[in-house]
Amino acid sequence: MAPEDDDLDDELEDDEDYDDDDERAAPQTEVTIEVTGLSLYTHHGVSAAEREVGQRLVLDLRLEVGECDATVTDLVEDTVDYAAVCERVALVAQQRSYKTLERLCSAIADRLLADFAAEEVWVKATKPEPPIPLPVESVSVEVWRQSSGE
């Protein structure tokens, strides 16, 4: 066993002696949660055909959580659960049709701020194959919002 391994074993043993009261007294850390490439089939677009037939939409999200107890407690209930965030975003994106990505991103941002403990949210929606008559790889819209602090 290498000497570094002995040091690591000692550190791990020391961690086992660390109790919950010590953890709660430790300084908190600012946390940002990012979700990249959430791919959903949706019905958004200016044309009736886009809204009827639908298309793949890719969403990227960033939530500024601020101080987060989970950095110390290691408990998912002490942070924003990114699986729940993805489920909520999918619900907003798929429950109705919007003509513009701007409105869709705004609706998602509003829902995230209302439902999760985030100080700021950033939402980017990308259409990988936009229905325009020019060679374009993708189009996207970004919306950034801050919590009202209530």
State what each model feature region is.
Residues 1-150:
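N-terminal, polar/charged subdomain of small-to-medium soluble alpha/beta proteins
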